[in-house]
Design a protein with these regions (language model features):
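Short beta-strand segments at enzyme active-site cores
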Residues: 46-50, 83-86, 117-122, 152-153, ...
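Active-site beta-loop-alpha junctions enriched in small/polar residues
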Residues: 21-23, 52, 87-91, 123-126, ...
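Active-site mouth loops of central-metabolism enzymes
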Residues: 20-30, 88-100, 129
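Active-site groove signature of glycoside hydrolases
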Residues: 110-129
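Short, well-ordered coil/turn segments that N-cap beta-strands
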Residues: 11-16, 43-45, 78-82, 115-119, ...
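Beta/alpha (TIM)-barrel catalytic core signal, keyed to glycine-rich beta->alpha loops juxtaposed to Asp/Glu
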Residues: 130-310
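N-terminal binding-site loop/beta-alpha segment at the start of enzyme catalytic domains
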Residues: 1-80, 144
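Short, acidic/polar
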Residues: 28-39, 97-112, 161-166
Length: 310
C-alpha cells in the first residue's frame, strides 16, 4: 500500500501502524520477528511501542517490546526505513511526565531500541501532577537535541490537548503532532465527543489504538463459543446484540470486497475525520495478513457502519 504523510511532520507511513504491544508478551522473539518481516514485505514501515510493553507479563520488567524491535532492526539493518513511535509515563520505574523522568526514560528507550533517535515520542498518558510547561519543555529539549524527531500525546482529553498545544505555540516549543486515543466502531463517544474537534482544528493526526476492539472486530468471537486468547476477557463488553450486529455487517461488506472483517473495521476507522493511521497488532503472520491491507470503503458503506454504531 502507498505510504501516506503524517500531518505536521516530514514522515510518510504505511496506512496501518503495527502495534508492538504483543512483542515480548503473547508473541516471543521468533514470532515477533516473523510478524515484523511480513509487515515490511507489505511495505510496512510504522511501528508503535512503549517502554511499559510488556511489564505486566510475569518475568518482564519493561522495554521488552522495544528490545525485540531493536534486535530486529539491528539484524535487518533497516533503522532508516522504519518509523518508530514509543512512549513514556506508564512504566513503573519511569512513571510520570516530569522533566527528570522524561530525560532519563528517553535514554532507556534509545538503548533498548539500539538507535540514536526516536521518530515519534508520546506522552503515554496525561500527568496532572506536573505542569504542562515542564513536560513540554522537556520534550522540546529532546527534539532540539536530535534524540526525538516529533512529539505526540496519548490518552489526553481534548481540553488538555488544546492547552498543551497552546503552551507550545506561546513558548515556541515543539508541538504535539498526533493524538493516540481509544477509538473504534464500537467505542466512538469518548473520542468523537471530546478530542476529535481539537485534532481536526489543529490539523494533527489521530492514530487510534484498540481499533479492532481488542480483537472482537476480527470476527473470531462468535456467540456461544470460547476463544483462547490473552485478550478474551477484555471483549466481554462487546459480546451483545449490538456487537454481533456490527460484526455481521462487517462480514457482509468484507464479502463484497473479498477481504477480511478486520480490514473493513480498520477501513471505517481510517476514513474518519482526523484519523491518519489506525493501530492494530498481530501475534502471528496469519493475523497480520488479516489486517495489513486496509479496505477502501465507499461512502455508503462508511455511512451504513456509522449509522449502526452511532
Amino acid at each position: 500500500m502507498t505510504h501516506i504523510p503524517l500531518n505536521k511532520t516530514d514522515l510518510k507511513v504505511h496506512p496501518l501502524c503495527l502495534g508492538g504491544n504483543v512483542f515480548g508478551w503473547s508473541a516471543d522473539e521468533t514470532q515477533s520477528f516473523a510478524v515484523l518481516n511480513a509487515y515490511t514485505e507489505h511495505n510496512g514501515n510504522f511501528i508503535d511501542t512503549a517502554d511499559v510493553y510488556s511489564e505486566w507479563k510475569d518475568g518482564n520488567t519493561g522495554h521488552d517490546s522495544e528490545t525485540i524491535l531493536g534486535k530486529w532492526m539491528k539484524q535487518r539493518g533497516n533503522r532508516s526505513e522504519i518509523v518508530i513511535a514509543t512512549k513514556v509515563a506508564k512504566l513503573s520505574t519511569r512513571a510520570g511526565l516530569s522533566a527528570t523522568n522524561i530525560t532519563a526514560a528517553v535514554d532507556d528507550s534509545l538503548r533498548a531500541l539500539q538507535t540514536d533517535y526516536i521518530d515519534i515520542y508520546y506522552a503515554h498518558e496525561d500527568d496532572k501532577t506536573v505542569p504542562l510547561l515542564e513536560t513540554l519543555g522537556a520534550f522540546d529539549a529532546l527534539v532540539k537535541s536530535g534524540k526525538v524527531r516529533h512529539i505526540a500525546a496519548s490518552n489526553y482529553t481534548g481540553e488538555r490537548l488544546a492547552e498543551a498545544i497552546e503552551i507550545s505555540k506561546v513558548e515556541g516549543f515543539a508541538q504535539y503532532v498526533a493524538l493516540q486515543n481509544h477509538y473504534n466502531l464500537l467505542e466512538r463517544k469518548e473520542f468523537e465527543g471530546d478530542a476529535a474537534p481539537v485534532v481536526i482544528q489543529e490539523g494533527i493526526s489521530a492514530i487510534p489504538y484498540f481499533g479492532l476492539a481488542r480483537g472482537f472486530l476480527t470476527g473470531k468471537y462468535r456467540q456461544g463459543e470460547t476463544v483462547n486468547s490473552v485478550r478474551a476477557a477484555g471483549v466481554a463488553a462487546y459480546e451483545n446484540e449490538r456487537g454481533y450486529q456490527v460484526v455481521s455487517l462487517l462480514h457482509d461488506i468484507a464479502k463484497t470486497h473479498n477481504t477480511t472483517i478486520a480490514s473493513v473495521a480498520l477501513g471505517w476507522l481510517a476514513a474518519q475525520p482526523g484519523v491518519s493511521t489506525p493501530i492494530a497488532s498481530a501475534r502471528t503472520v496469519e493475523q497480520l495478513q488479516e489486517i495489513v491491507n486496509i479496505a477502501s470503503l465507499s461512502a455508503d458503506e462508511i455511512a451504513e457502519l456509522s449509522d449502526l454504531t452511532k
